[in-house]
C-alpha cells in the first residue's frame, strides 16, 4: 500500500537520497534554503511504511494567486515501478491543486546516454520506455531539446567519475598546461568563508568579461553556510613579489648567456635568447605595474563546490581575465576535482555543456576526461485548465530571455 507524508524528517530524507542512485544536491533537504524566494514542500512516498521516493518541490508564485510546481532533478523514485509512478503523479496533482498550481514541471535523473569522450556512447533504452509510461499518465515531455536555454537544468553535463580521473589520464596538452601554470608561480589553496571575498571578486571579473549577470556575494555565502561541512572554495593565486624575483633571476641568466655569444653562435640560438628576453621583460613590466598599484597577492581563478553524499558539484567558477596568460583555469579545475575525490566524492560534476557537443564549454571541460551524460529533459504535468495558455506564455518568455 502506498502512502505519502509531508515534510519528512530531514535526516531520513537525506539518508534516503544519499543511498539512492538518483540522489542529488538539488533534491537535498537544505536546497530550499538556497531557493528561498520560492515556496517549498517536501513530500515522501512510502510503500508499507518504507520510504521509496521523495520530491523536493519548489513553488513559484504566479499572478492571480496561481503557482507553478518545479521539482529539480526529481522526483527521486524507481520509474520502472509503474504503480509507484502512478501514485506519485496522482499525489503531485492533488498537492498542486491545493496550491493552485497550473502544472508540475520536473526534470528527473533519467539518462538517454552516457559515454567518455572518444569512446562508444551507451544508450539507455529503458528511459524512452519510461517516457512512454509518463505519457500514458498524461505527462507532457518537452523532448530532446537542442538549445541549452530551452531547459532549466542542463540536458547535457560533463561529470568526472573517480575511476577515470588522474593526472596520467589527462591529455599531454592538459598536463603541460598544469605544469606551465605551476612553473609560472601559480599556487592553489582551499577554504570556505575565508576565501569568499576573493572568490566574489573573481565572479565579478567573469561577469564583466562575459557581459552577463551572475550571483552576488550573499548568494555564494548562503551556499557555504547552508552546507558548512560539505562545501569549499578552490582559489589559485599569484604572489607578485615572489614571481617578480623569479622572473628577474631568469632575465639575469638570459643576459649572462647572451654575453657568451660570439660570431659563431647559431642564429637560431641568438633569436631564441632574444625572444625569451622580450618575454621576461614584458612580464616584469606587467608585474611591476600591479605592484605599483599596491597589489601583492592576486587571485587568478576560483571555483565553488558543494558536496552531497558521494557526489560533488562545481557550481560556480570565475577567472581574472587580466592574468589569463598564467593559464589559471585548468589547474584550478583540476585541483577542485582532485580535492573532491580526496574528500570522498565518487563523481565530480562540472556542470552543463552545449547540447550539440560543440563550443567553449565542452572544449574546456573535455580536458578533464569527463563522462558526457545526456538527460531525458523536462516534463510538464498539467494540473489546471490554464496549463496550455500558461505554457505558451512560458515558452515565449524563455525564448525572449535567451536572446
Task: Give the role of each language-model region.
Residues 1-3:
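Extreme N-terminal starter segment of soluble prokaryotic enzymes
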Residues 5-65, 111-113, 117-118, 138-151, ...:
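A conserved beta-strand-loop-helix scaffold within acyl/acetyltransferase catalytic domains
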Residues 33, 291-292, 352, 356-403:
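C-terminal catalytic domain of photolyase/cryptochrome flavoproteins
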Residues 65-150, 298-302, 306-367:
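Acyl-donor binding region in acyl/amide transferases
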Residues 102-104, 202, 234-236, 348-350, ...:
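A general structural signal for short secondary-structure boundary/capping elements
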Residues 106, 144, 191, 217, ...:
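Residue-level detector of family-conserved "landmark" positions at structurally sensitive sites
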Residues 118-122, 156-159, 205, 363-364, ...:
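Short low-complexity, flexible loop/linker segments enriched in glycine and/or proline
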Residues 208, 341, 371-373:
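Bacterial peptidoglycan biogenesis and beta-lactam-recognition machinery
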Amino acid at each position: 500500500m502506498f502512502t505519502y507524508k509531508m515534510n519528512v524528517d530531514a535526516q531520513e530524507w537525506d539518508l534516503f537520497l544519499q543511498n539512492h542512485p538518483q540522489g542529488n544536491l538539488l533534491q537535498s533537504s537544505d536546497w530550499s534554503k538556497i531557493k528561498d524566494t520560492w515556496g517549498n514542500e517536501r513530500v515522501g512516498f512510502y510503500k508499507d511504511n518504507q520510504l521509496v521516493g521523495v520530491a523536493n518541490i519548489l513553488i513559484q508564485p504566479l499572478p492571480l494567486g496561481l503557482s507553478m510546481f518545479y521539482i529539480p532533478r526529481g522526483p527521486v523514485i524507481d520509474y520502472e515501478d509503474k504503480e509507484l509512478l502512478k501514485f506519485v503523479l496522482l499525489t503531485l496533482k492533488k498537492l498542486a491543486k491545493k496550491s493552485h498550481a497550473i502544472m508540475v514541471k520536473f526534470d528527473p535523473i533519467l539518462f538517454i546516454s552516457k559515454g567518455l569522450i572518444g569512446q562508444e556512447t551507451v544508450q539507455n533504452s529503458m528511459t524512452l520506455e519510461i517516457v512512454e509510461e509518463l505519457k500514458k499518465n498524461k505527462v507532457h515531455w518537452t523532448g530532446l531539446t537542442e538549445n541549452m536555454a530551452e531547459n532549466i537544468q542542463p540536458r547535457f553535463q560533463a561529470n568526472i567519475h573517480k575511476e577515470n580521473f588522474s593526472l596520467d589520464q589527462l591529455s599531454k596538452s592538459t598536463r603541460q598546461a598544469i605544469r606551465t601554470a605551476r612553473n609560472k608561480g601559480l599556487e592553489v589553496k582551499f577554504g570556505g568563508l575565508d576565501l569568499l571575498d576573493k572568490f566574489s571578486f573573481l565572479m565579478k571579473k567573469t561577469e564583466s568579461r562575459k557581459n552577463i549577470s551572475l550571483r552576488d556575494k550573499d548568494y555564494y555565502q548562503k551556499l557555504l553556510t547552508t552546507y558548512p561541512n560539505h562545501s569549499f572554495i578552490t582559489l589559485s593565486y599569484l604572489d607578485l613579489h615572489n614571481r617578480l624575483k623569479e622572473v628577474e633571476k631568469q632575465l639575469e641568466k638570459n643576459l649572462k648567456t647572451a654575453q657568451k655569444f660570439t660570431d659563431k653562435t647559431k642564429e637560431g640560438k641568438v633569436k631564441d635568447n632574444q625572444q625569451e628576453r622580450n618575454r621576461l621583460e614584458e612580464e616584469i613590466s606587467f608585474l611591476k605595474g600591479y605592484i605599483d598599484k599596491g597589489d601583492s597577492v592576486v587571485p587568478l581563478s576560483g571555483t565553488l563546490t558543494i558536496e552531497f553524499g558521494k557526489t560533488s558539484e562545481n557550481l560556480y567558477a570565475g577567472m581574472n581575465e587580466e592574468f589569463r596568460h598564467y593559464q589559471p583555469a585548468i589547474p584550478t579545475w583540476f585541483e577542485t576535482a582532485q580535492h573532491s575525490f580526496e574528500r570522498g566524492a565518487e563523481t565530480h560534476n562540472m556542470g552543463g555543456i552545449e547540447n550539440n557537443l560543440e563550443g567553449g564549454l565542452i572544449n574546456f571541460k573535455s580536458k578533464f576526461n569527463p563522462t558526457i551524460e545526456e538527460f531525458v529533459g523536462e516534463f510538464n504535468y498539467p494540473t489546471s485548465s490554464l496549463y496550455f495558455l500558461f505554457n505558451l506564455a512560458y515558452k515565449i518568455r524563455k525564448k525572449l530571455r535567451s536572446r
